């Protein structure tokens, strides 16, 4: 998520009792939800309604009942997610029709903030940066993302306003934000970052 405070995004498994076509009631079905932490100690999990990865809805598919992501491996610009797929629920005929699956997603694209033709704005809390560059993980081929820096009280800083920012219109994992002034001039000052998103998705940002 485009929140620098989130230290990690990992997957967790969730299971609920329920009916699946061709199975007895309560056979159990499983899917994957996201968990996250801000301090590396306390973890939170999405609600059951916020599924990250679901079983194949096609009856008879090898992963129709269960799709539990276990391990992940970074391969270049992609994340390989290996998951356990069950044809039947985990309470039904154990060890029958179970296989391993692989899903490939672009790196660090678990969740996003997005907007349509009407631009939306996302504002961070106050930050004190010690950085020379800001990069965005975005999908903005049909729209654009701009960024402006404001004071902690919300006043746009000259040279770092939306109109001073070159629009990002790419599908990129690390698109560099360019203003009329270098980001290093804001070093040590409390600021907020505001993202203007139009027909685009913002997955993450990084300062370095």
Give residue ranges: language-model regions.
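Carbohydrate-active catalytic/glycan-binding domains of CAZyme proteins
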Residues: 1-208
């Amino acid at each position: 998520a485009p929140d620098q405070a989130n230290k990690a995004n990992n997957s967790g498994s969730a299971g609920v009792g329920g009916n699946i076509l061709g199975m007895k009631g309560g056979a159990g079905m499983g899917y994957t939800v996201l968990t996250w932490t801000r301090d590396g100690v306390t973890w939170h999990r999405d609600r059951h309604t916020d599924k990250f990865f679901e079983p194949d809805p096609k009856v008879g598919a090898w992963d129709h009942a269960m799709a539990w992501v276990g391990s992940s491996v970074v391969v270049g610009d992609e994340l390989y997610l290996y998951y356990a797929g069950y044809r039947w629920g985990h309470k039904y005929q154990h060890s029958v029709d179970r296989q391993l699956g692989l899903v490939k997603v672009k790196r660090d694209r678990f969740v996003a903030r997005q907007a349509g033709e009407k631009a939306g704005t996302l504002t961070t809390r106050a930050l004190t940066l010690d950085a020379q560059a800001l990069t965005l993980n975005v999908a903005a081929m049909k729209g654009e993302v701009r960024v402006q820096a404001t004071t902690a009280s919300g006043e746009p800083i000259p040279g770092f306003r939306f109109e001073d920012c070159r629009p990002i219109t790419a599908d990129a994992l690390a698109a560099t934000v360019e203003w009329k002034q270098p980001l290093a001039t804001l070093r040590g000052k409390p600021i907020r970052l505001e993202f203007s998103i139009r027909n685009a998705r913002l997955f993450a940002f990084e300062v370095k």
